[in-house]
Amino acid sequence: MTDHLKHIGVADPQRIEKYTLRTEAENDILKIYYKKEKGDLFHRSLKVKFPRLQKQLLVDSGGAKRYENTSEIAPNLLHVLDELDKITSKETEQVDVKEKILKDLRHLERVVNNKIKEIERDLDKLSSR
């Protein structure tokens, strides 16, 4: 299941926490972040560059036969991303729900605190009259 990940140097796929993908010039840059272990100050990560596939596409079919250079993601990177999605999506689904609830709770707490302060200010105005 993780053959492509092992091929790019991922020794322990179960420790993968998340990943990012960006394009720079003619390369796709994949950065894999590992779960932080006890005593680690920073997350460990692995950065891998994948050259983009270069292609020429026919852009004018009206007889001029004009071609344009284009690039696309490499097939081996697609396989790696598929494996990463399988590993990270299970954890992400569970964490996302918990994070959303915590975020909503913090927001509600701020709203209630602000409303309490507003009511207290209104009470102060009434008592100073």
Curated annotation (Swiss-Prot):
It comes from the Bacteria. Transmembrane segments: none annotated. Coiled coil: none annotated. InterPro entries: UPF0325. Disulfide bonds: none annotated. Belongs to the UPF0325 family. This is UPF0325 protein HCH_00487. It comes from Hahella chejuensis (strain KCTC 2396).
